[in-house]
Amino acid sequence: MSDYDHARIKKLVLKGEKLKKSKKRKKEKDEAGSSKKAKVVVDEDAVKHGGWWAAKTAADITGTVSIEFGDRSYLKAMDNGLFTLGAPHNAGDGPDPEEIFTAFPINDRKVAFKSGYGKYLKIEKDGMVTGRSEAVGGMEQWEPVFEEQRMALLSETGHFMSIDPQDDACVALRKKVGQHEICKVRSNASRDVVIDTEPKEEKGDLGEVEKNYVKKFQKFQDKKMRINQNDVKELEQAKAQGSLHETLLDRRSKMKADRYCK
């Protein structure tokens, strides 16, 4: 194991806390067959990033993470305690080792990031972001801010982390979010995936749902779609009562728009 990797896996140290010798943990035995494997829904965005998925909430930002600016370019730690933007990666590739951090939740809003060199990201008085802190204080804490499917990292001084377009250095100089402040924190942790079991015909509003089922079952000899012109409130009521499919079938049969209805 390299010095970089060895440093990256150490625990969070708060300022004023004494260092304790780590104790070896016994490996937990895998309970094979104790739980069924969950069905996986493919996250196309994660596939393009080597399996690293984008955090949607602050709770997602924990453990092994990367910080992406732009498309497949990640914040990279350097051995002088500074950060730069790494070179763009090919589709399907994940971040390099120097582009991988460990995130430690401070509370339900803020996190601290430790580089692979074992130092915490800190906002300096001049706006530079450095990685030279041995422990976490206020200046080492960052708040992920989410708005309209975009994210930015807010420092203790009220400035957002960004990449300087002049030299690709990591800074936090602006109190408003622009294109250079928008980023994504990505994780490669395993996660529970919500399986989409809704039939494709039932996506959209009830008017679209009815059209979808007509397309699926209608006899198209004359190439004309026959839609029941009665108010869709009938469908809303049927959905609330759990009889949507029966009502849709009845409406199609009245229009002779179902090849299975006589």
UniProtKB/Swiss-Prot annotation:
GO terms for cellular component: Cajal body; catalytic step 2 spliceosome; cytoplasm; nucleolus; striated muscle dense body; Z disc. It comes from the Eukaryota. It is found in: Nucleus, Cajal body; Nucleus, Nucleolus; Cytoplasm; Cytoplasm, Myofibril, Sarcomere, Z line. Its main location: nucleus. CDD domains: beta-trefoil_FSCN_FRG1. Residues 28-39 have a biased composition (Basic and acidic residues). InterPro entries: Actin-crosslinking, FRG1. PANTHER family: FRG1 PROTEIN, FSHD REGION GENE 1. May have a role in processing of pre-rRNA or in the assembly of rRNA into ribosomal subunits. May be involved in epigenetic regulation of muscle differentiation through regulation of the activity of the histone-lysine N-methyltransferase Suv4-20. This is Protein FRG1 homolog. It comes from Drosophila melanogaster (Fruit fly).
